[in-house]
Amino acid sequence: MIQMQTELQVADNSGAKRVECIKVLGGSHRRYASIGDVIKVTVKEASPRGKAKKGSVYNAVVVRTAKGVRRKDGSKVRFDGNAAVLLNANGQPIGTRIFGPVTRELRTEKFMKIVSLAPEVL
């Protein structure tokens, strides 16, 4: 469950290391985002030679949450921390690699690129 001011790790090689959620997209008073939701983030910590610079604002898709996601069979998939993948204006990932596992809930038309780049899909 991601809300405003939640800090997330970045799960790609875009150059950002840590981002902060500044808005949950998808409704005027929407409070929480879960896996597969798009949020607006600002870069809080970045590597010196990356594409993403500190202070820049991007859209990002949430790929892992500590809260987890419940499946129809009753099982629940949870992670140790929260992570996101930065997106460009067209909704495509900025990085060319994804680090760590992602969930099957991302298998929509919009995020198939992220699923195909991920080393493991849970």
Curated annotation (Swiss-Prot):
Q: Which keywords appear in this protein's UniProt record, sorted alphabetically?
A: Ribonucleoprotein, Ribosomal protein, RNA-binding, rRNA-binding
Signal peptide stretch: none
What Gene Ontology terms describe where this protein resides (cellular component)? cytosolic large ribosomal subunit
HAMAP family for this protein: Ribosomal_uL14
Query: What job does this protein perform?
Result: Binds to 23S rRNA. Forms part of two intersubunit bridges in the 70S ribosome.
What gene is it encoded by? rplN
How the protein assembles, per its UniProt entry? Answer: Part of the 50S ribosomal subunit. Forms a cluster with proteins L3 and L19. In the 70S ribosome, L14 and L19 interact and together make contacts with the 16S rRNA in bridges B5 and B8.
Q: Name one GO biological process term.
A: translation
| Protein name as it appears in the record | Large ribosomal subunit protein uL14
Q: Name one GO molecular function term.
A: structural constituent of ribosome
